[in-house]
Amino acid sequence: MSVNPRAVGALLGTAALLCVLGGCGASPAHERGASEAGRRFAAALAAGDYRTGCELLAPETRDQVEEDAEGPCGPALRELELPRAGATRGVDVYGRDAMLRMTGDTLFLSLFHGGWRVTAAGCEPQAEDEPYHCSLKGG
């Protein structure tokens, strides 16, 4: 079977155009927003500001933290002793969800009306094709 190089080029060009118009890939604004929210969360925990850390959690995640601890979020978040996150290594945004890889930790975030919120933290990769294991996650 022979393949016409012009036809392949036209097809790839059309696919690229559709991808751009259809929103393939994350916008820099979404990547920046998710990264900034994750860094604020990590900085709050590093500073011992658990109140701010709780404010940056997604509602279901915060509810789960309080339910598991049978108490308020701040002290419960402190007791989790999440790993200290450092420099950003990368961010992947998939629609309204993001994964932020930082030195020492991986965070998962979702976009809400009020901005990006942390849905899971203290996450470690498992064997290939297995989900991350997270110390902090919503219900």
Language model region names:
Residues 49-62:
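Short, well-ordered alpha-helical segments enriched in acidic and aromatic residues
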Residues 32-48:
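Short, aromatic-enriched amphipathic alpha-helices that serve as compact interaction elements
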Residues 1-12:
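Bacterial N-terminal signal peptides that target proteins for export
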